[in-house]
Each structure stands twice: as C-alpha cells, then as structure tokens.
Amino acid sequence: MEPILQESDSRFVIFPIKYHDIWKMYKQSVASFWTVEEVDLSKDLDDWDKLTKDEKYFIKHILAFFASSDGIVNENLAERFYVDVQCSEARCFYGFQIAMENIHSEMYSLLIDTYVRDNIEKMHLFNAIETMECVKKKADWARKWISSNKVYGERVVAFAAVEGIFFSGSFAAIFWIKKRGLMPGLTFSNELISRDEGLHCDFACLMFKHLLHPPSKEVITSIIIDAVNIEKEFLTVAIPVDLIGMNCCLMSQYIEFVADRLLTELGCEKSQCI
C-alpha cells in the first residue's frame, strides 16, 4: 500500500506537517484565491458585438466546454481522490481545489450568461455535455477515469492530462484574443483560471512523485497520447482555431509541446508517437 493512501487516524488533524512539499503547494493555492466579483465584464459586450460570427462561435463553444469540465473535475475529487488519499496535507489541497473549481465553473457560466442573449442557445451551451458531440467526447474520457477501477497512480496521470492537456489549447486560444486587445474580462479570467489549473496539474505530478510503485512509463505514455489525440481533434477539427485566425498546425505542435513537458514531469521520455 502506498504511504499516502494508507489509512491512518492522523488524516483527521493537520499538524505536525509530514509532507512539507504538499503543504507548501496547498498554501500556494490558498494565496491565489479570487472570486468572480473581481472580474469586470462591463467592457466585454462592446468587443463581443465587434467579433465575427466565426469568432463568436469559437468562444461560445470553448466556454461551453469549460463550464462543464470543472464539474467533472470536482466529481472526481469528491468521489475518488479525496477518498483515496489519506494524508491531511493532500486533503487540504483537494478540498481547496474543489472550492476553486466551483469558482471557475461560476465564472464560465457567467461569461456565457453575459455574452449569449438568446435563452435557447444559452441552455444549449450550458448542457454542452449532452448537446455537443465534441464536448461530450472529452467529458466521456474524463468520466471514464472517474469510474475506473485502475489504481490511483493511473487515475492521477489521467486527470493531470485533463487539467494539463485538455485545457491548454483553449487557454492558449483565449490568450490569442488578448493579444488583439479584445474582451478584457474574458482574458483576465483566463489568466486567473489558467494559473490555477497549472497549479492543479503540478500538484497531480507532485502526488505522482510520492508514489513508491508508480505506473509503468508505457502506461503513462499511453494515457497522455490518448488525451493528446482527443485535444488535437477538438481544436483542429471540431472547433478549429483557424476560426479566430490561429494556425491549426501550430496549435497541434503546441499541444504536443505541453504533452512532452507533462511526460517529462512524470518521469518519462518525450514520445515520438504524439
């Protein structure tokens, strides 16, 4: 049994700190706290009305994916990871992550509610897991890992991929919009959320490094490649980034770069199959 998964009554108290690196990352997460009220959307609507039909389509579908994905991450945290892990330092992080994912979900829902005036279209976006095949495909992959009977090590790799790969291309696309000087509320919230998700992905890698018996490099690489292929399809075929003037080929390369970095963090070599 992995030490961090070994049941102990010490999980009910925080001190004395045993895993100082995990505790440090928890405190880093707390220091990054923010709320949706800090994001000013008042100037976004003027920019929204200036966007092309394709640009609006792209942003709406990206927001629809994000609005549903944070709830999936939270379900995994509440049902699996918080139950799996027995050290109080990690439970503190997971508990705070749940709170932050709720704020992310609220932010994305508020963005959709602000930009989309038609109520029928709005509900279509809020129910993207059911109404959009491209969003459903990503959601199904993540939910498959929530219900999986695989060991914690494999599941933590999968959710590192969700937060490190499934989100990365969409974050980059919104940063592209920022470079054009548009949508200050959207782009500021993107900065805050991408910072949080980067920390969540780093924490998954940290938890992985605490495993004495991690999954094989072959298993890790297979999980990452699977996520990369789904993300490439999402941003180059289903909702292609060329709708907002980005290069699909370069986006694919960026996703590969992110995946290679994640593989390195997980102790693997860069994959030639990505």
UniProtKB/Swiss-Prot annotation:
Q: Give the top-level enzyme category.
A: oxidoreductase
Active site per the UniProt annotation: 108
Q: Does the keyword Zinc-finger apply?
A: no
On the tree of life, the source organism's domain of life is Viruses
Gene3D superfamilies hit by this protein: Ribonucleotide Reductase, subunit A (1.10.620.20)
What does the UniProt cofactor note say? Answer: Binds 2 iron ions per subunit.
Entry GO MF terms: metal ion binding; ribonucleoside-diphosphate reductase activity, thioredoxin disulfide as acceptor
- Tell me the InterPro entries matching this sequence: Ferritin-like_SF, RNR-like, RNR_small, RNR_small_AS, RNR_small_fam
**What Enzyme Commission number(s) does the record list for this chain?**
1.17.4.1
Q: Which residues bind Fe cation 1?
A: 70, 101, 104
Query: What is the documented function of this protein?
Result: Ribonucleoside-diphosphate reductase holoenzyme provides the precursors necessary for viral DNA synthesis. Allows virus growth in non-dividing cells. Catalyzes the biosynthesis of deoxyribonucleotides from the corresponding ribonucleotides.
Which family does the record claim for this protein? Answer: Belongs to the ribonucleoside diphosphate reductase small chain family.
The name under which this protein is listed is: Ribonucleoside-diphosphate reductase small chain
Question: Which source organism does the UniProt entry give?
Answer: Swinepox virus (strain Kasza) (SWPV)
